C-alpha cells in the first residue's frame, strides 16, 4: 500500500493537470462541434453561478474577483498575478494559458478568454455585478463591478 500513499503535493499536481486537460478538451469539443465556445461556456457558467450564492446578494466585487483568481489558480496553466479594487469594483489579472497547453490540446487563447468571460459573466450577473474582460500584455483582466 505504500506505493499508493501519495503526498498532498502529488495529488494537487495531478488534479491541476486533469482539470486543465478537461478544460481544454471542453474548449476544443465546443469549437469542433459548434464552431464557437459560446454555448458550452454559457452552459458551464449557468451551472456554476448558483454555487456562488453563498456570497450573498450584496457580494463584494473584491471578494468575487479574489475567488475568480482562486478558481483559475487551481489550473496548471493560468496564474492570478494581481488583485486590486474594493467592494464596488475590483480587478484580477490572470497570466496564461501556457502555450504548451494550447498546442497540446489544439485550443486557442481567444477561445480560452471567451469561455472565461462567459463563465465569470454568468457568476457576476447572478451576484448583481457586471464583468468586463480584456487581454493585454499583462494577461486576462477580469473587472467585476456592482451595478
What name fits each language-model region?
Residues 1-91, 98-115, 133-147:
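N-terminal accessory segment detector
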Residues 117-133:
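Low-complexity, intrinsically disordered Gly/Pro/Thr-rich segments
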